[in-house]
C-alpha cells in the first residue's frame, strides 16, 4: 500500500504506483526511469520524492499524465528546482512528484537511443513498460539537474562505481549534435557538478575532458 509520507522509501511503493498507472493506460506506453527511484531499487538511496520518467514522445507523456490524473494526482507546472530540466508538467500527490519528460531532458540533451538501449532492466506493469536507466545516465542527469539531494546522489553513484568511459561517450555524443550554442548550456551544468564532486575529494577521471 502506498504510504502517506512525502517520500517513498520502499521500492514496492514505486512498483505499486506503476501498476496503477498501467491499469489506467488505454495504450502501451514505454518510459525510461532515470533518477532516485532506480537508486532506491539498487540500495544506493534511502528515500526519494521525485520519480523521473522519460517518455519517447509527447503523445506517451500526455497518456501517462492522464493516467496519473485519473489516479488523483494534480497536474501542475514545474517548480524552480526544475528550471534546468525539460519537464513542463508534473503530477503531484501527497507531496510526491511524478516528473514526466517527453524526450528532452535539458535543452538539447535528450533521450538518446544509446540511453534507451543501456537500460539495465525492463519491467511491464499492464500497459506501462518501464526501463531502468543505467547508473551512468542517472549520474549525468543528476549532474545537470542539481536539485536538492542530487549532489549526494552523484557522490553515492561515484562511490558505487561508474563506467566513466560510458559517461563521457554519452556526453560527447550529445554535445556534438547539431544545434545552437545556447541549447548546449547543459554542458556547463555538468562541468559545475563535476567540480563540486572534486571539491569533496572524489576522483572524476573525465573531469579534465569536460572542462570547457
Segments from the language model and where they lie:
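Compositionally biased terminal segments of proteins
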Residues: 1-212
